[in-house]
């Protein structure tokens, strides 16, 4: 019975972590020096809550690091906290475009070679 209870608690904790309800890790919370001293900027936590509900991204203004929060599959926020889906998608698109560009360059080089061969044939005649 204790084993089942501890397994459920562990699973609930992992789900909570993957959904973005993690405590702040050092420089991910922006602090501002106000009259009374340092106070945590509440807008940053609001953005984090919004991203956790929608499965979006949180960009830390202090560190400049984008952290994926929740969404995108089970436990993705727990196992890959800095995983950037948009960047991976852009890399795939760029790779595809570079393949198309290589094909274009190959065809252009072939046309250029044919023109040079034609000029050499005209000069030899």
Swiss-Prot record:
Residues 1-26 form the signal peptide. Transmembrane segments: none annotated. Belongs to the RxLR effector family. Keywords: Host nucleus, Secreted, Signal, Virulence. It comes from the Eukaryota. GO terms for cellular component: extracellular region; host cell nucleus. It is found in: Secreted; Host nucleus. Residues 21-66 are annotated as: Disordered. The RxLR-dEER motif acts to carry the protein into the host cell cytoplasm through binding to cell surface phosphatidylinositol-3-phosphate. Effector that acts as a broad suppressor of cell death to interrupt plant immunity. Inhibits cell death induced by cell death-inducing proteins, including the PAMP elicitor INF1 from P.infestans. Induction: Expression is up-regulated at the earlier infection stages. The gene is RxLR22. A motif (RxLR-dEER) lies at residues 32-50. The keyword Signal applies. This is Secreted RxLR effector protein 22.
């Amino acid at each position: 019975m204790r084993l089942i209870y501890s397994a459920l608690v562990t699973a609930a904790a992992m789900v909570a972590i993957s959904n973005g309800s993690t405590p702040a890790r050092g420089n991910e919370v922006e602090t501002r020096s106000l009259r009374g001293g340092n106070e945590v900027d509440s807008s940053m936590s609001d953005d984090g809550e919004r991203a956790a509900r929608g499965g979006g991204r949180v960009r830390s203004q202090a560190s400049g690091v984008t952290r994926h929060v929740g969404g995108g599959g089970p436990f993705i926020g727990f196992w890959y906290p800095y995983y950037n889906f948009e960047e991976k998608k852009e890399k795939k698109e760029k790779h595809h475009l570079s393949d198309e560009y290589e094909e274009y360059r190959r065809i252009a080089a072939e046309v250029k070679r044919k023109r040079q061969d034609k000029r050499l044939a005209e000069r030899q005649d």
